[in-house]
């Protein structure tokens, strides 16, 4: 039987009238159910999002609280470290010395070429220079073995360099006495010592002579001088420990101004030690007059050079029988050297710091600088290119003879006049520089 178009349309109409409402009802129920499911899912997502937001806010709040607490702790630790932390050398208030006017002395510059310069090879950080029998001796560290905490006494004739002896620690100074024995000031983390090396045993044995004063370890020994009568003078820069070496001790004393530096004399015949001068704020250098009757002591923080009798006992810097040869120096004096004609050469470790002396009467900022550590302290002091590195004064009348400019050479750590030439040791340099006099 064939169904035509009319019959087909009639069948569709009857079917739609019969089952159409049921289909529509089914679709409606399904759509309603789907909407309810979607609504529940949307509510769950909204709840999850709200819960996540609440948890995130709580976490951020806890993090902010922890960050605030951590920041406050760091701030308190920083304040304690820089302001309240106990230190071995608390700063003392003092009166800053006056600033000297220009002396008008003759100007000399360090030799710019290699003429007169002594190349020490791998040796550097010269702490002391002496001349004897046409040879130049220098206390220096081997640049290839700086971490070994040892120093060498080096001898050179200008072309060949040889190590005479090696000591454990920092060889801060040495001097020859009349018999040819060598006297050494040696600094180790445990303290300082005055030692002797007999002229017939150089390179084999170094004898410790003085390691304590009144039962206390010797402080940071900085210089030694041998008098014509055989007595040996040695300086202690400060009473504080010297774990980081002489330069660190001098910087610390410059900031703290404890005034605990002293000068002692050792009598080899009597084997006795006598205090000559105390109350020095950084006894960094010594020199004796040509006849050995007068002792000169550089006072680092007070920017002056004290003059006392070589026979003096237990004097105080600036007190009775202790006068200043020169004062108000343009820098902080360190090494001293005496010419046979009585001219005293003064080497400057650093140029005068206006910041330091502005805060001379206050201990807060200087205490912060002391606690801040070595890196900051090194940035506080320097020797600019236009600052004098060495000056010469006539000890007879106090007149200024010469000013040596360093051209940015750096801190002067050693001086030695030899005839018409002045040899200089500079911090960190592998060469002994010179200037024509």
PLM-predicted stretches and their roles:
Residues 93-125, 158, 398-407:
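A short helix->beta-strand "capping" segment at the edge of beta-propeller domains
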Residues 114-147, 409-413:
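Beta-strand-rich domains and repeat architectures in extracellular enzymes and scaffolds
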Residues 117-123, 163-168, 209-216, 275-281, ...:
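Surface loop/turn motifs at the tips and blade-to-blade linkers of beta-strand repeat domains
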Residues 121-122, 136-145, 182-190, 232-244, ...:
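Conserved beta-strand positions in repeat-built beta-propeller and related beta-rich domains
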Residues 131-134, 176-179, 226-229, 290-292, ...:
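Residue-level detector of Asp-centered blade-edge/turn motifs that repeat once per structural unit
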Residues 142, 148-193, 210-213:
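Blade-loop segments of beta-propeller domains
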Residues 143-145, 234-258, 349-384:
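Short, conserved, GDST-rich strand-edge loop motifs in beta-rich repeat architectures
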Residues 185-227, 235-251:
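Asp-box/WD-like beta-propeller blade repeats and closely related beta-sheet repeat scaffolds
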């Amino acid at each position: 039987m064939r169904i035509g178009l009319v019959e087909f349309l009639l069948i569709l109409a009857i079917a739609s009238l019969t089952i159409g409402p049921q289909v529509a009802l089914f679709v409606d129920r399904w759509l309603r159910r789907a909407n309810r499911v979607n609504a529940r899912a949307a509510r769950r997502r909204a709840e999850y999002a709200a819960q996540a937001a609440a948890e995130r806010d709580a976490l951020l709040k806890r993090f902010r609280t922890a960050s605030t607490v951590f920041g406050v702790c760091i701030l308190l630790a920083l304040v304690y470290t820089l302001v309240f932390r106990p230190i071995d050398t608390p700063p003392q208030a003092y009166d800053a010395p006056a600033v000297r006017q220009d002396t008008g002395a003759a100007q000399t510059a360090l030799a710019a070429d290699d003429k007169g310069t002594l190349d020490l090879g791998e040796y550097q950080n010269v702490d002391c220079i002496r001349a004897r029998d046409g040879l130049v001796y220098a206390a220096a560290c081997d640049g290839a073995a700086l971490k070994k905490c040892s120093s060498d006494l080096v001898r050179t004739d200008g072309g060949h360099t040889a190590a005479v002896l090696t000591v454990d620690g920092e060889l801060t100074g040495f001097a020859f006495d009349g018999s040819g024995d060598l006297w050494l000031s040696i600094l180790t983390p445990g303290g300082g010592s005055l030692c002797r090396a007999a002229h017939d045993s150089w390179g084999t044995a170094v004898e410790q002579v003085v390691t304590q004063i009144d039962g206390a370890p010797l402080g940071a020994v900085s210089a030694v001088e041998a008098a014509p009568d055989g007595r040996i003078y040695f300086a202690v820069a400060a009473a504080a420990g010297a774990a980081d070496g002489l330069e660190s001790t001098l910087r610390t004393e410059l900031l703290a101004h404890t005034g605990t530096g002293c000068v002692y004399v050792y009598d080899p015949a009597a084997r006795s030690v006598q205090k000559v001068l105390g109350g020095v704020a950084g006894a960094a250098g010594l020199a004796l007059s040509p006849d050995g009757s007068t002792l000169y002591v550089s006072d680092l923080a007070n920017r002056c050079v004290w003059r006392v009798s070589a026979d003096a006992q237990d004097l105080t810097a600036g007190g009775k029988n202790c006068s200043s040869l020169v004062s108000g120096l343009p820098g902080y004096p360190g090494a001293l050297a005496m010419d046979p004609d009585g001219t005293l050469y003064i080497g400057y470790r650093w140029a005068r710091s206006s910041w330091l002396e502005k805060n001379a009467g206050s201990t807060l900022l200087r205490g912060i600088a002391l606690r801040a550590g070595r890196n900051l302290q090194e940035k506080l002091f320097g020797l600019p290119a236009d600052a004098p590195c060495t000056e010469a004064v006539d000890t007879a009348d106090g007149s200024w003879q010469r000013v040596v400019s360093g051209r940015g050479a750096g801190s002067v750590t050693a001086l030695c006049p030899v005839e018409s030439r002045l040899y200089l040791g500079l911090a960190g340099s592998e060469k002994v520089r010179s200037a024509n006099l």
